[in-house]
């Protein structure tokens, strides 16, 4: 292989890389990063041990979401300059360091420097936790997420939808694995000490991500060159391309993140209305079950919708998932049955996940593979902004109008998705390739 074919000076295997192995390595990396979606698993133990308020533990997650989106924006242009392997190594370093710094913050608040009841000790512990898990870890999240999607898409130009769907599905599966398997086991092994559990998690993910990075190679120039779209230069002059792309991702994410933040409460309210004799424990169990099933739907939806986009066109499928999810939201206020409610919720969450599987390939088809990473990073800032706005706003609705909050939320989500669908159709005319199966 010539230097031209390996511009990043990455170590190469003796035989040609197996793109299936690279895809598997990417999924493992994303599954590690996806553990951030299971943050709520640790919130109650943290609040019990450190006496932090709900807004404090929520802020840590919001910082991680913001870190993912805005570090992805910064990482986008670097993919073409540094290559996938180098950036994924950076991602691993930041992500694992985030857990280690967070563990340090928790140890500081566990009596090392003073009583956690002392205000300055509590705040110092919280600030270090937020800096580690939220800021440092968030940088690792965005760097790895953006790089993995761009790199894997480059290796599978003939099946971009399926490949990117697999990658982002790994992110969703990682959250389910953390909340139901790894997290409980780490806490059990650590004796219920969150700081010790974070050290265990950092060690395990450090090994997994290191092995995954060793199996990642940037796409060979010959693999993707004949598939790279040439439309990017044609449409580069349009001043509103980035605005429409950002608004599409923002409005679509607003609907998903707002409901995800209230899933347990919504399910408990519906279950209690259907059977007022249910105990608090039974209601909590119903909420937890819906979260687990919806998480699985989120993961599977990322793959299925993306795979469908390979066969029926990116814009067609993206618009379909937005429109049908919007209709489901309109039905939800009238879903008094817990079973019907669960089915509708799982569908809208699966569609939310499907958007993440479809957007990277849609961007690549519209603007070319060379600009995919930078524009995908821009789109993720729309998601990050929605993550900062939607959960607090939906929580505000519950505080002010608890009896009508769910109904208002469903209609807002429906309107947001329909607005996103209109934005998608507004770019459909940019290139006919987006309305036909991928070449």
Label every PLM stretch briefly:
Residues 98, 111-143, 250, 340-354:
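Hydrophobic core of transmembrane alpha-helices in multi-pass small-molecule transporters
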Residues 46-47, 78-79, 177-191, 267-268, ...:
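Interfacial helix-cap and linker-helix signal at transmembrane-aqueous boundaries
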Residues 93-122, 324-336:
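C-terminal ends and interior cores of transmembrane alpha-helices
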Residues 39-44, 240-306, 390, 394:
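Extracytoplasmic gate region of multi-pass secondary transporters
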Residues 175, 367-402:
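A late C-terminal transmembrane helix in Major Facilitator Superfamily
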Residues 195-214, 408-426:
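Symmetry-related core transmembrane helices of the 12-TM Major Facilitator Superfamily/SLC fold
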Residues 46, 142-156, 163-164, 354-367:
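Intracellular juxtamembrane helix-capping segments at the cytosolic ends
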Residues 249, 286-288, 292-362:
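C-terminal transmembrane helical hairpin of 12-TM major facilitator-type secondary transporters
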